[in-house]
């Protein structure tokens, strides 16, 4: 899995798999699109207004927690 983020547009994309086939984009809401293959496999999720969608804190940081290891990492989302 890979997460990309473009702070200029506040857009993130969560890659669940690399695209190996043509996908169909389904608009789930005004702020979320999901890319799905013909067999129903989800390839990725596009998040518009990513700071809010990803639950960034008031300083624009996304905190990723590895529950198994009890470790966390911070990613700066805001400019």
Protein language model annotation of sequence segments:
Residues 1-79:
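Small, basic N-terminal interaction modules of short regulatory proteins
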């Amino acid at each position: 899995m890979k997460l990309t983020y473009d702070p200029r547009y506040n857009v993130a994309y969560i890659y669940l798999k690399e695209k190996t086939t043509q996908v169909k984009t389904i608009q789930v809401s005004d702020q979320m699109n999901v890319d799905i293959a013909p067999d129903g496999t989800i390839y990725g999720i596009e998040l518009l207004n990513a700071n809010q969608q990803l639950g960034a804190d008031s300083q624009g940081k996304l905190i990723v927690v590895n529950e198994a290891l009890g470790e966390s990492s911070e990613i700066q989302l805001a400019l």
